Amino acid sequence: SAASDVYKRQVISLAGAQPVLLRPGYITKEQLEDAMGCAVALSDAVLHKLKDGERAASPGMKYKHYAPKADVTILKGSFDAYKEYMKSHCADGVYALCFTGEEPALPCPCVTYGRADRPDEQAHALFSALRELDARGAKTVFARCPAQEGVAMAVYNRLLRAAAFRVVEV
């Protein structure tokens, strides 16, 4: 199902001297290293846009996958900083993509994608949350940034693509 695509679509290249994680998923980079007994490199394309003319090594690395129709920006920072940013940017068509339980403190309409400390919930809720934003007619979305390690790396990678790599430090 689309809800579990964050976990199912993991890609690892064994074509070179060192394994390369091209697309993170449920099995973390650290777990792969333990199981394989060697270092696993993280492809630059996991956290950054491909450079002009650079070829994608795996499907899903090149395009803005799963993005809603709205413009999405990831906001990196504390919840207090996110809340202040939302207060100054709340307008018609602006939505918060936040963690479950945060919505009462936010001034804009909200769609949640799991609890802040539960990347497994985030992984299962992210795509349906993005579709919900479409259904509600969101024009602009400011997303809370998930963690960037372990299983949450997969969530962050998919959200980065939905945001076309737009990230703002708050």
PLM region spans:
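Short, small-residue-biased leader/transition segments that mark boundaries at the very start
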Residues: 2-7
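Short, catalytically relevant binding-site loops at active-site mouths
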Residues: 28-29, 47-49, 79-80, 102-103
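Residues at the C-termini of beta-strands that transition into short coil/loop
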Residues: 1, 15, 25, 44, ...
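A C-terminal functional module that forms or caps the active site or interfaces directly
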Residues: 56-164
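Short, flexible loop segments at boundaries between secondary-structure elements
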Residues: 168-170
